[in-house]
Amino acid sequence: MNEITDKNLPTLERATLGGGCFWCLEAVYQQIQGVKSVVSGYAGGARPNPSYESVCTGATGHAEIVDIEFDPKVVSFRDLLEIFFVIHNPTTLNYQGNDHGTQYRSVIYTHSDEQAKIANEVVQELEDSKIYADPVVTQIESAPTIYPAEDYHQNYFQQHPHQGYCAAVVAPKLAKFRAKFKSLIAPQYA
């Protein structure tokens, strides 16, 4: 019988990202090898325990986010950010496609000084590359309190792949990810 010690357990990290509707981000990050969990939620606002309805008004200040738990020995924070900047438009202030409001802002909530450094480096590399005609408006902030979204928002695309928004918006982002990052797709999704 093998002894279970802390040395045998992976040291997991968190990444918290907002870039439009959380259903899109959740669907992508769930398919990445090394990602252990993805929770759709809200962060960055003043009201504790916000509801979807209150966040949708734009009055709470929260962003729709995904809180990702990952094994950095399998997938790096930089990898997660490179995916992030491919699957959403970081140059549009407070909207993605037809989703408008501060709750859809592009934001990276960091959980360490190292994550903040990497996030700033990746944004600077994007700016220097001139991939986008407009400046990157992604906010980089220390992670605030994160509130999980309601249960019906969790695993949304997996449960409703043919729902209108999922078919029109989420599926194309997922396809874009799968085409560009084949080596990062978890075996069960390959």
From Swiss-Prot:
Reactions catalysed according to its record: L-methionyl-[protein] + [thioredoxin]-disulfide + H2O = L-methionyl-(S)-S-oxide-[protein] + [thioredoxin]-dithiol; [thioredoxin]-disulfide + L-methionine + H2O = L-methionine (S)-S-oxide + [thioredoxin]-dithiol
GO BP of this protein: protein modification process
Enzyme class: oxidoreductase
Molecular function as annotated in GO: L-methionine:thioredoxin-disulfide S-oxidoreductase activity; peptide-methionine (S)-S-oxide reductase activity
UniProtKB keywords: Oxidoreductase
Gene3D superfamilies reported in the protein's UniProt record: Peptide methionine sulphoxide reductase MsrA (3.30.1060.10)
SUPFAM superfamilies the record matches: Peptide methionine sulfoxide reductase
The protein's Enzyme Commission number: 1.8.4.11
Active site per the UniProt annotation: 21
Family stated for the protein in its record: Belongs to the MsrA Met sulfoxide reductase family.
Free-text function comment from the UniProt entry: Has an important function as a repair enzyme for proteins that have been inactivated by oxidation. Catalyzes the reversible oxidation-reduction of methionine sulfoxide in proteins to methionine.
HAMAP family membership: MsrA
Protein name listed in UniProt: Peptide methionine sulfoxide reductase MsrA
